[in-house]
């Protein structure tokens, strides 16, 4: 059992009490984590797309999928079927391992890091935030990167309430910024 899953099992009683949940099955929990990268201008360069997919696969510990555009949009210079991004969905042990790595290793390595913004909740219990570059993860070697890129991380929880999702993530060790940002 991963360290973060064990931590979740340890905080369940306190979490149930704080969220006012009677039924054990209503206890908030992590369902999945989605890591996505938009290709943007790099979408035309197949070498760069492959490098980005390899980097995200290394970070996630699971093979990333290249997402293609569904239809052409002239304003974005996007063609139907052209690569538009990379995505990987983590569940189970991979999800807990990635979350542990994110909270305990990657985020503390960010220069001038003051916490993730509190305003990333979507009103349905999910949390979104972005990272500026991928170099904070220990698996990524600077020499193997063609171009640095950011990523969007979506943490999906089983609750529909933002306050319960915030409590869950805070108890799991997510470093939120102080104040109301």
From Swiss-Prot:
Functional summary from the UniProt entry: This is one of the proteins that bind and probably mediate the attachment of the 5S RNA into the large ribosomal subunit, where it forms part of the central protuberance. In the 70S ribosome it contacts protein S13 of the 30S subunit (bridge B1b), connecting the 2 subunits; this bridge is implicated in subunit movement. Contacts the P site tRNA; the 5S rRNA and some of its associated proteins might help stabilize positioning of ribosome-bound tRNAs.
Key word Transferase present: no
Protein name: Large ribosomal subunit protein uL5
Pfam families, A to Z: Ribosomal_L5, Ribosomal_L5_C
Alphabetized UniProt keyword annotations: Ribonucleoprotein, Ribosomal protein, RNA-binding, rRNA-binding, tRNA-binding
High-level lineage: Bacteria, Pseudomonadati, Campylobacterota, Epsilonproteobacteria, Campylobacterales
Any GO BP annotation: translation
Summary of subunit composition and partner proteins: Part of the 50S ribosomal subunit; part of the 5S rRNA/L5/L18/L25 subcomplex. Contacts the 5S rRNA and the P site tRNA. Forms a bridge to the 30S subunit in the 70S ribosome.
Annotated Gene Ontology cellular component terms: ribonucleoprotein complex; ribosome
Single annotated GO MF: tRNA binding
Membership in a protein family: Belongs to the universal ribosomal protein uL5 family.
């Amino acid at each position: 059992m991963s360290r973060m899953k064990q931590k979740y099992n340890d905080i369940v009683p306190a979490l149930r009490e704080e969220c006012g949940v009677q039924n054990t099955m209503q206890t908030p929990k992590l369902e999945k984590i989605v890591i996505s990268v938009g290709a943007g201008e790099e979408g035309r360069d197949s070498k760069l797309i492959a490098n980005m997919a390899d980097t995200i696969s290394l970070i996630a510990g699971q093979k990333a999928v290249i997402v293609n555009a569904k239809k052409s949009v002239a304003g974005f210079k996007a063609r139907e079927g052209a690569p538009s991004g990379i995505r990987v969905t983590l569940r189970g042990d991979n999800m807990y391992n990635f979350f542990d790595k994110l909270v305990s290793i990657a985020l503390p390595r960010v220069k001038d890091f003051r916490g993730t913004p509190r305003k990333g909740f979507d009103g349905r219990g999910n949390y979104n935030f972005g990272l500026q570059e991928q170099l904070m993860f220990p698996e990524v070697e600077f020499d193997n990167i063609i171009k640095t890129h950011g990523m969007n991380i979506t943490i999906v929880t089983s609750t529909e309430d933002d306050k319960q999702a915030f409590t869950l993530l805070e108890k799991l060790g997510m470093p939120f910024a102080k104040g109301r940002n």
